[in-house]
Amino acid sequence: MTSLKQRDELQAAIWRIANDVRGAVDGWDFKQFVLGTLFYRFISENFCQYIEGGDPQVHYAQMANEDVPSEVVADAIATKGYMIYPSELFVNVAKHAYTNPNLNTDLSAIFSAIERSASGTESESRIRGLFADFDTTSNRLGTNVDEKNKRLAAVIKGVESLDFGSFEDHEIDLFGDAYEFLISNYAANAGKSGGEFFTPQNVSKLIARLALLGQAEVNKVYDPACGSGSLLLQVKKLLGEGVIEGGYWGQEINHTTYNLARMNMFLHNINYDKFHIALGDTLLNPQYGNDKPFDAIVSNPPYSVTWVGAGDPTLINDTRFAPAGVLAPKSKADFAFVLHALNYLSARGRAAIVCFPGVFYRGGAEQKIRQYLVDNNFVETVIALPPNLFYGTSIAVNILVLSKHKPDTRTQFIDASGEAFYKKETNNNVLLPQHIDRLVDIFAAKADVQYVATSVNHQAIAENDYNLSVSSYVEAEDTREVIDIAKLNSEVAQTVKRIDTLRADIDEIIKQLEA
């Protein structure tokens, strides 16, 4: 079986299981149990592989807890970031899942033990609270202990039945792909609420490629509103292992999504010392001010959310916002995220940020921020994307590309909203690989393409009140039928002549009838 076929079959199976085991429970509400169980299996098998070290004589899952040497425990915590004793492994819990009357409390104790194993170590912040959303006492599992255990057992046995093969034989990231597949499906089915934490992979790939263009290596990659981490992971997939020296950095305000992001890092084989995901409000409580700058910033922040803005008089003196001389409006924080990203961007780096289109043409504070960005030559490109690419919204959003190392003062505008840049599917439009390739090529070339792309000098933008809407600069193709007026007039004349002839013939017939 080819690796891609294996992946497709695995994903079909895991979605079938996810729907079967949830029963009448809404899939969105049940997602943490399926995702958490998949993660539990992954770290168990990953941990076994590490302990056994490829030695066929070592069978860690069959060992007694007390037989694990203390030096092995210390090494595992230092290297992997956590400890899982043999009895706590997924495979051993799954053996007796249907017959264990204490399954829910045993699982809770195991998850707590894994988290406690990192206490006081470098990995603590990556492990602490990781299983917080896997509530084994939740009423979503059932109304009594027996019902809860049956549903937990069904999830565990379902995940156990999935064929991931052995870690050493994986040609593709099966666990990570399965997790991303589940998140994607949950997001698609949840509509608007799902779109808040997941950026579709095709859009993520475009954003990552824009941010990384021309960079063979980057010091660190950062997403200030990282959701489930999908954008950060696209950077990993594009650059591969070892290229990002300082790792992956992100901040997320939603606790459940924050845990999904941390699990996602582990599931894609990013070790605890290579990722930094923080919980909190990026705009009011940024966590990585001492860790900037970043060579690559990718982000799909929430659109037009409210924030305190001018309600907090200290923010105008914040080094992120002060240079613009004005704060983003209280009702629309979009440019606050943009200015935050700009402040964290290195002199050699690039930021690619998804933006609501209104920020590019509205007046007031947003116009002043646009002026600051353009006058200081930070805006490299604005790209208008097709509509209906994201879950939960049909809005045609834009991508703003920021750079601090532009070779000239021109700003590029690309209109990728037309049908030549997407494929229409049942519920959403999709960017195919050829669409992404063409967009990146146009972005890289900076050449004018009729009806698609143009580069505009600073003066022209200033004279247009710093409007950065793509439609203000890229002429839309007139797809109406071209009419040949001379030919049309000739045809009209012939038709009139024919009508006159017919009218004369009719008059002659009437005369004959009256005679």
Give the location of each predicted region.
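Generic marker of residues within folded, mature protein domains
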Residues: 168, 240-241, 267, 390, ...
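N-terminal hydrophobic or amphipathic segments with adjacent small-residue motifs
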Residues: 30, 221-223, 255, 346, ...
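Glycine-rich, flexible loop segments associated with nucleotide phosphate handling
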Residues: 73, 174, 221, 329-331
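Conserved S-adenosyl-L-methionine
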Residues: 193-299, 304-315, 320-325, 335-336, ...
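A conserved structural/catalytic subdomain of Rossmann-like adenosyl-cofactor enzymes
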Residues: 5, 285, 291-515
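Non-catalytic, mostly N-terminal accessory regions of nucleic-acid modification and defense proteins
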Residues: 1-206, 210-211, 215-216, 273-284, ...
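Tryptophan-centered motif/residue detector
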Residues: 15, 28, 258, 307-308, ...
